[in-house]
Amino acid sequence: MGEMEREGATAKVGAGKVGAGKVGAAKAGAAPAAAQGAGTKVVAAQGAGTKVVAAQGAGAKAAAVGVGKVGAGAKAVGGTIWSGKGLALGLGMGLGAWGPLILGVVGAGAVYAYMKSRDIEAAQSDEEVELRDALS
């Protein structure tokens, strides 16, 4: 039940994660261990089922790099503003591009309320001074 990351693709090896069932679990679990022991490269392709490919040589490394680039490209497209992963505050609230806008509106409202309360306090203070002067 291990998890490996190679070249931007993730291979999950386990009884419930291989193909459509448990049939290839033992073979899939043994393939990465045998492949790494021999100094070969393990590449995983994400699709309907997880495929583990043990490759060796320059051509296989080039193929592995190609798989990594496809995974990175898909990740870059998936992380846009509209999915909530691009332009965001990182608050974990799922606001996406709306987060900075909402924060700006709340900030502007707070500044407006503060300035308004200062004006009201100044007016009350002036009234109190006038009242004190009138009573004395």
From Swiss-Prot:
It is found in: Magnetosome membrane. InterPro entries: Magnetite_Biomin-Domain. Disruption phenotype: Normal magnetic response, slightly fewer, slightly smaller magnetosomes. A double mms6-mmsF deletion has an intermediate magnetic response, with slightly smaller and fewer magnetosomes than the single mutation. Deletion of the 4 gene operon (mms6, mmsF, mms36 and mms48) gives an intermediate magnetic response with fewer, smaller magnetosomes in irregular pseudo-chains. Deletion of approximately 80 kb of DNA, including this gene, leads to cells that are non-magnetic, lack internal membrane systems, grow poorly, have reduced mobility and take-up and accumulate iron poorly. It comes from Magnetospirillum gryphiswaldense (strain DSM 6361 / JCM 21280 / NBRC 15271 / MSR-1). The gene is mms6. Promotes the formation of magnetite in Fe(2+)-rich conditions, when magnetite is not readily formed. Binds both Fe(2+) and Fe(3+). May help control the production of crystals with a specific morphology. May function with MamX, MamY amd MamZ in biomineralization. The 4 genes of this operon collectively influence magnetosome size and number. Full length protein oligomerizes and interacts with MamA. This is Magnetite biomineralization protein Mms6. May undergo cleavage.
